[in-house]
Amino acid sequence: MRRWWLAALCALVLLFGAAGAEAAEVLQVRSGTLLQVGDHNRTYTVELACVAIPEGGNPAATEWLRAALPRRTKVNLRPVGNDGGTLVARVQRLGSADAAIGSDLGSGLIAAGLASPKPSC
């Protein structure tokens, strides 16, 4: 009986965990933490989750993100919240042979020394 409950719980976690991921296409990199993405006939402003950039922005972070996410790049969004109408999500690049694909772009900015992790994450 216990194994059955454990199997059912694992199945639910896998089912709902996968439902949180949505593929989208990058339309524009607005700043070091803000993207404009499209999903069929809708567009979203997406803020990278768990990443902090100094007030006034960081031009090097914006350029890094533009190089990592050219227009029409497919991305996977893992929503973590909403901030005044802006979707806050972990963003992963999809569909390329590049070694950095699949890694969280916020973590990439932090590893490059262009951003710092938010204390709340």
Each language-model region and where it sits:
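Small beta-barrel nucleic-acid-binding modules, primarily SNase/OB-fold domains
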Residues: 2-6, 17-121
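Classic N-terminal secretory signal peptides
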Residues: 9-15
